[in-house]
C-alpha cells in the first residue's frame, strides 16, 4: 500500500515536471507570435509552391503580404506589455526591440508591391524571391530581440544568407554575380571578425553570453576597463560596421547596389540598417556600458567619415543606384549621431524617428527608379533629363523624395534631421552636428542637380530613353505606383505629425 502511494506520488511529480518543461517553451512561444506568423507564412508558401502551377502566382503575393500585415498587427497588440526575457535568456521583448521590428516589417510590406511588376517583366522566379524576403525579415526581427551573443550572431547570418541570394538573383547578369561575390566574401570576413570580438567579450566576462550577465561578469572579474574589452570593442565595431556600411566599411555597398535587382536593393538598403542599428544600440549600451569613453570617439570618427565621404563621392556618380549607395553611407552617419547621444538626451527617439522617415524617403526613391528602369531600361542619371515632359507624376514623386532625403523644409526629412541634430547639439556633439549640417547642404546640391535634369525642357538635353518613354509595359495603376504614392505621402508629412511620432519613440526604453 505504501509502495503504491509512493509510486503514484512519483508519477504525479514526474507529470508536473514534464508539464512545466513543456509549458515553458509554449509560454515563451506566445511572445514571439509575430515571428511565428512569418514562419507559418513561409511554410504555407512552400506547400502551395509544391502543389500549384503558374495560375496561383497572385496567391504567393497575397500570402506574403498578409503574413507581414498580420505580423505587424500582432506586434501592435503587444505594444506596452511588460519586458520579458525568453528562451533561457536568448530573446527579449520590450518596446525598444518591438519598434525596430515594426520598422523592418514595414520595410518588407512596402518592398513586396515594388517587386510584383519587376518580377513579371524580368521573368524571375517568384516563390524563391518571396521566401528569401520573408526569411531575411524573420532574421532581422530575431536580431532586434537577440539577448545573447549566440543569437546576435545567428540572427544576422540568417538575414545575410538570404541577402547574398537575393543580390545574385539575376544569375545571368555579370554585374549581379560580381556584386554577390563581393558581398559574400566581405560578409564572411565581417562575421569572422564579429565572432572574434565576441570571444574576447565572452572570456573577459568569465564565460557569460547573455548581455546583462556579461555586464555582471565584467564587474565580478574587474575586467570592464581591461585591454581585452578594448580589443573586443574594436572587433565588434568592425563586424557591425559591415552591416551598417559606414565608411570605411562601405566598399561593398556601391557594387551591390548597382549589380543587384532594384527591388532587392530597396529592401536591403533599409532593413539591414534598421536591424543592425537595433543590435548596435543594445551591444554598445549594455556590455560596453563602462567603455562609453572609448566607443563614443570611435563612433564619432565613423560618423564623420561616413557623412563626408558618402556625400562627397555621391556628387561624382553617374548611376542612380550608385548615387543612392553613397547617399545611404552619408545617411547612416546621421543615424550614428543618435546612437552616440543615447537615451539620456533623446538620441534613441530621434534616431528612430529619422529612420522611420528614411524608410519612406528611400523606398519612395527606389520605387521611382524601379518604374523608370522598367519603362526605359536605363539607370544613368543623365537619362532622366526631361522626364517631367513625359511623366509629370513620376518626376514630381522622385523630386519630392530626393528633396526629403536632402532635408529641405517642410518635408519629413527636414524635421527628422532637425530633431536628430538638436539632440546631438544638446549632448555637446557640436563638431559632429556641424559636419552633419555641412554634409546635408552638400547632399542637397546633388539632389537638386538631378531634379534640374528631371524638369529640363530643352530638347538637346533629352536622351532617346525619355523621348521614347511610354507608360507600358506596365498597367496604368500598378503596385509599384501604389508603394510610391504611400512613400511620397509619408515623405512629405508636415512637422505637425512629429510630436506624436517622437512621443511614441521616447517610450522605447530598454
UniProtKB/Swiss-Prot annotation:
It is found in: Plastid, Chloroplast thylakoid membrane. Its EC number is 7.1.1.-. GO terms for biological process: ATP synthesis coupled electron transport; photosynthesis, light reaction. It is a multi-pass membrane protein. InterPro entries: NADH-Q_OxRdtase_suN/2 (IPR010096), ND/Mrp_TM (IPR001750), Ndh2_N (IPR045693). The keyword Lipid biosynthesis does not apply. Pfam families: Ndh2_N (PF19530), Proton_antipo_M (PF00361). It catalyses: a plastoquinone + NADH + (n+1) H(+)(in) = a plastoquinol + NAD(+) + n H(+)(out); a plastoquinone + NADPH + (n+1) H(+)(in) = a plastoquinol + NADP(+) + n H(+)(out). One of its GO terms (cellular component) is chloroplast thylakoid membrane. Belongs to the complex I subunit 2 family. NCBIfam families: NDH_I_N, PRK02504.1. HAMAP family: NDH1_NuoN_1 (MF_00445). This is NAD(P)H-quinone oxidoreductase subunit 2 A, chloroplastic. It comes from Oenothera argillicola (Appalachian evening primrose).
